[in-house]
Regions:
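Asp-based, Mg2+/Mn2+-dependent phosphohydrolase catalytic module
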Residues: 1-99
Length: 99
């Protein structure tokens, strides 16, 4: 994960699940960024909704266990990807990330 992300936090470290925005808010704080400046990568629909409602742009990542929520994820997220390479292509195309 360190190859792609500056900070990685877990729900157990924070003491709250992804149905609460605390993990996302603490991640933004750790990065020294505002929510609207912090990309959230999520594979769970409920978590994507939580992050979006807290003001974060969300990139949806496919996960087999959440397949039934693909259309909802596509509506909630600024981008929805089957693989990390697709996410990187989206970020490059939008000037958000450069390899």
């Amino acid at each position: 994960a360190a190859e792609y992300f500056q900070t990685v936090l877990t729900c157990s470290e924070i003491g709250a699940g992804k149905d609460e925005p605390e993990i996302y808010l603490q991640a933004a704080q750790a990065l020294g960024c505002k929510p609207e400046e912090t990309l959230v990568f999520e594979d769970a629909f409920h978590a994507a909704c939580t992050a979006r409602e807290a003001g974060f742009p969300v990139i949806g990542v496919y996960d087999e266990s959440n397949r039934r929520f693909i259309h909802q994820m596509q509506e909630q997220c600024i981008c929805y990807c089957d693989q990390m390479e697709e996410c990187i292509e989206f970020l490059n195309a939008n000037g958000i990330y450069r390899e």
